Amino acid sequence: MGEISITKLLVVAALVVLLFGTKKLRTLGGDLGTAIKGFKKAMNDEDAGVKKDVDGSVQAEKLSHKE
């Protein structure tokens, strides 16, 4: 009874499609994919920034206020 069979998965998938519809699921999948790509990109950008700081190859710029 505790096992998840392919039949149970198909029934759950059919219920989800009936409840939400294929259009809503398609847009939800696209939004989820975009969010994951954005998260991965942000993680890679932050890792690159940390490596630059550790190497010391990037110097901090002095900022001044112009009036």
From Swiss-Prot:
Q: Which family would the database say this protein is a member of?
A: Belongs to the TatA/E family. TatE subfamily.
InterPro entries according to UniProt: TatA/B/E, TatA/E, TatE
Respond yes or no to whether keyword Transmembrane helix is given for this record.
yes
Domain of life, per lineage: Bacteria
GO cellular component assignments:
TAT protein transport complex
**What gene, per UniProt, encodes this protein?**
tatE
Q: Which GO terms describe its molecular function?
A: protein transmembrane transporter activity
Name the predominant localization.
membrane
**Does Protein transport show up as a keyword for this record?**
yes
Name this protein carries in UniProt: Probable Sec-independent protein translocase protein TatE
Q: What biological function has been recorded for the protein in this entry?
A: Part of the twin-arginine translocation (Tat) system that transports large folded proteins containing a characteristic twin-arginine motif in their signal peptide across membranes. TatE shares overlapping functions with TatA.
Q: Where are the transmembrane segments?
A: 4-21
Q: Which UniProt keywords apply?
A: Cell inner membrane, Cell membrane, Membrane, Protein transport, Translocation, Transmembrane, Transmembrane helix, Transport
The record describes its membrane topology as: Single-pass membrane protein
The record's annotation in Gene3D superfamilies points to:
1.20.5.3310
Q: Where in the cell is it found?
A: Cell inner membrane
- Signal peptide coordinates: none
